[in-house]
Every structure is written in structure tokens, then in C-alpha cells.
A protein has these predicted regions:
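Transmembrane alpha-helix interface motif
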Residues: 1-41, 47-58, 141-151, 155-158, ...
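Membrane-interface helix-boundary motifs at transmembrane edges
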Residues: 60-66
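Hydrophobic alpha-helical transmembrane segments
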Residues: 25-26, 44-46, 66-69, 73, ...
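A diffuse structural propensity rather than consistent per-protein peaks
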Residues: 61, 101-102, 241
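Juxtamembrane/interface alpha-helical elements of multi-pass membrane proteins
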Residues: 69-185, 189-192
């Protein structure tokens, strides 16, 4: 928990850091669509190279990347386990009643785990290289055209920004609550059953603390006379630059490579 940093910005001045947040959000969406269209392990190769290239250019330390990804690996494990029982093609390797694990299910589980890990790594690069306020501003600007039809663009951007800021806070609160319960004699470690018991002793004080932080944030916004977008100005104006165009070209090349590989696999 102490190393949890997903959603936390890592300061830097790389080419990735300098990209417009709108470019990162749009290309992040294209990256997700591209990764979802991959239909085989060979298609994951250009995606993996693309992700490695992003982190190499951003110059974010490997240790920081791994620490920010570690809490998300539980999702990868759950998805992989579920896929173990979906594809029953190939030779049956293990069977217990109606539960079967075959060669096809192993391939499916490994493929889904790799694809989901790459998707998370790609999106994690956005939060590591973009301040939360810039992400909020970029998201709000992208939704601005829809404000004419009644979509609350500013409010949605604010919600996203607060959610990203609260991720590390939530993890810190959970760590502090678990330590406090342990100091009072509660068992907060020890295998899967220990994890379930920990949730029972940590959940109520954890959510109490989260609601307290939410009330404090609400009071702080009221004290600063926050009334939404009205009268709000920005220190740095968003602007597309040459680097944004280059990033778009590279992402489109990735999409083209994945399409070509998929056609070869058909």
C-alpha cells in the first residue's frame, strides 16, 4: 500500500510530458480500441513495443511504473482465472466435475492477461505523465462541444479530477486504518481468509474516513466560493503542438500494424 501510486503524477520534462492532455486522452482511447482488436499473441507484439517506447521516452523510472501497476494486477489475475474455464478447445489438462482446463483455455487466459496488462500499462502512462489538473482541463475541453446540448462538461471533468486525486488518498487511508486495527490486536494479514477478515475490520473505519475527507473537500470548495465554471480562468492555456501530431502519427501506425497482423492471422 505504501508504494501505491496509480493516478499519481511523476514530474518530468520529456516529450510525453509535454504533449497536450487532449492528445493523450484521445490517443489513449485509440490505444484501447487498438488493443481490443488484437486477435492473437502476434498482434500483442507491436502493442508491447509501443508501450515500452512510451515509457522509454517518458523517462519514468521502472520502479515507479511497477509500483503503480502492482495494485492492478489483482484484476489481471481474476480475469485470467475466469478465462481458464471459457475456451474448452484442445486437449483437456485438468478436470473436476464440470470444471475443465484445456490447452485452449490456458492460451485464452494467458492472452487475456497479457492484453489487459498492456492496456493498463498504456493508460497508466497517461496518469504518470500528466498532472491531474491538466487531465481535468483536457477532458473538459474535449466535452465542451457537447455542453451545447446540456452535457455538464465542467462538472464531469471535475469529478474525474477528484477521483484521480482520491486514488492515492484512498490507498493511504486504507494503510493507516489497517495499521491502526493491527495496533489494537486485529489480525489484518494471513492468506485469503485473513484478507476477508481484514475487510470486515477495515471497511467501516475506511469509508468513514473517506466520507470525512469528502466533507472536508466540500467545505474547502464552499469556502473558496466555487460555483462551477463561471468566472474561472486558467494559468496555462492548452494548445496543440508539433509533438502532438507526431504522437498521433505513431499511434495510427500502431493501429495499422495491428490490423495487418490480424489480417495475416485470418
Amino acid at each position: 500500500m505504501e508504494a501505491f501510486s496509480f493516478g499519481s503524477y511523476y514530474p518530468g520534462d520529456s516529450a510525453i510530458h509535454r504533449l497536450d492532455p487532449r492528445t493523450k486522452l484521445l490517443l489513449g482511447f485509440v490505444f484501447l480500441i487498438t488493443t481490443l482488436t488484437v486477435s492473437g499473441f502476434r498482434g500483442l507484439a507491436p502493442v508491447a513495443i509501443f508501450v515500452v517506447l512510451i515509457y522509454a521516452v517518458s523517462r519514468v523510472p521502472v520502479r515507479r511504473v511497477l509500483s503503480s501497476m502492482a495494485p492492478l494486477l489483482a484484476i489481471v489475475v481474476v480475469v485470467a482465472v475466469l478465462n481458464l474455464f471459457t475456451d474448452q478447445s484442445g486437449r483437456i489438462l485438468w478436470q473436476l466435475g464440470f470444471l475443465r482446463i484445456s490447452e485452449g483455455s490456458l492460451r485464452s487466459a494467458a492472452f487475456m492477461a497479457c492484453r489487459l496488462t498492456l492496456m493498463m500499462a498504456g493508460m497508466n502512462a497517461i496518469t504518470l505523465t500528466t498532472p491531474t489538473l491538466d487531465l481535468t482541463a483536457g477532458f473538459e475541453r474535449l466535452l465542451a462541444p457537447f455542453a451545447r446540448v446540456g452535457l455538464p462538461a465542467h462538472e464531469l471533468g471535475m469529478i474525474m479530477g477528484i477521483a484521480l486525486r482520491f486514488m492515492p488518498q484512498f490507498a493511504t487511508e486504507m494503510k493507516q486504518t489497517a495499521d491502526a486495527q493491527a495496533s489494537r490486536g486485529a489480525r489484518v494479514t494471513g492468506g485469503p481468509l485473513g484478507g476477508v477478515r481484514m475487510l470486515g475490520s477495515v471497511a467501516i473505519p475506511l469509508f468513514t474516513g473517506v466520507f470525512r475527507h469528502a466533507e472536508t473537500l466540500s467545505a474547502a470548495m464552499d469556502a473558496r466560493c466555487y460555483h462551477g465554471e463561471q468566472g474561472r480562468t486558467r494559468l496555462h492555456a492548452l494548445a496543440f503542438r508539433r509533438g502532438d501530431a507526431l504522437a498521433a502519427v505513431v499511434t495510427m501506425l500502431l493501429f495499422a500494424c495491428v490490423i495487418v497482423v490480424n489480417l495475416q492471422l485470418v
